[in-house]
Amino acid sequence: MFSPQIEWDCSQCQSGPTDRRKYCTNCHSMLSWTCTGAGKSGLHTHYYRHRDSCSYCTPELEEERQQKIEEKEVALQQHFQALNDEQRPWSEWKRTDASCIQHTGHDVEQIQELYSMCEEALINYCSHKNYRHTNSAATSYLSPMNLLVVTLWHLKHYHSERYIASELDLSQSAVNYFLSAVVDILHSCVYPELMSFPAGMDNRRILHGPEEHHKLIVGSTFITIPQPDNLDQRKAYYHAKSSTNYTLKVQIACDFRHRIIHVSECYHESVHDITVLRESGLLEHVNDSVQIIADKGCIGEEYVVIPRKKPHGRELTDEDNDFNRDINSARAAIENINQRLKTYAILGGVYRGAVEDFHKVAKSFRSFVLSVI
């Protein structure tokens, strides 16, 4: 059976065959087909495989095909759900909130909420990627839930890939691959859900700082890295207060509910704070009613509020001192967030990944922040 959606031709002699033989009657080359509905084409030998899966060529079979797809998806979800419940480490950690928090930084309910945000992407990854590199037949691959919790475990404690591989009886290459993949999934599925500007920021009833138009707070933190080999890189990454003297800079913004709403890209430590702020896109959202509280490094923008400097040769007035006290008190929110981030091993220690790929480091950092907020 040939569909009216199919056009036949001979690619060698450009003839338009009138019958449906496999080979051209003029030059004996194999005929080619083009499906005008699906926009696909191929040789005669592949036609029937296309026809059996094409809704344009066999619309009468589309309902049956759709039913089979749905049945397969349900069976797959049931399989992964059973695997989620039976496979360690989730089968062990989910027993108590204390165990779950100890390993991932989240309680059971929070883990399940995160999982619901990226369930489809995790299942698709498990379904389409053959990452089953293991050291024994005991564990063939990790379930979607275990991919998530093991990645959160890694982000919280920053265990080495070798250690995770030995704990889960997986190959190190498999651990490396799925950690990178799940960080991407977290970044694409969860980050946009949790990182967003408060609705109606210019509303007076929205929680604000010392003045009603103070709506956001920004502050920079750093990711400690090993000493670079290159002298120019050492100058660019130098930061005297870190354990290695070299860091990457990241800027974080929060609202007055202490909710993180933005994490910037990564920058050399030598890049000025105001440059990071200008490139973050945050300034596109400020106006008379929505202003940002920052530190003294962010001078030069109309709607960015910073502590007042002491005039040359004079002291600050009482009004200036009161203003600075209020601003510094408000900025304590972002400082507390940065301090809380530092209690996690991935920030409290030295970053082990490649620092040259700033975007990849930023994705890892943002995914890590998701495990804290």
Segments from the language model and where they lie:
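Short, flexible, mixed-charge glycine/proline-rich loop motifs
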Residues: 1-5, 14-18, 25-30, 45-49
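The −1 position to Zn-ligating cysteines in a subset of zinc-ribbon hairpins
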Residues: 9, 23, 34, 53
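Cys/His-coordinated zinc-binding microdomains
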Residues: 14, 28, 36-39, 58-61
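Short recognition patches in nucleic-acid-associated and regulatory proteins
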Residues: 33-47
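Charged, often Cys/His-bearing segments associated with DNA-binding zinc-finger transcription factors
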Residues: 59-139
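N-terminal positioning helix adjacent to the helix-turn-helix/winged-helix DNA-binding module
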Residues: 114, 145-146
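Short, well-ordered secondary-structure "scaffold" segments embedded in the functional core
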Residues: 147, 157-373
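Short helix-to-turn junction characteristic of helix-turn-helix DNA-binding domains
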Residues: 153-154
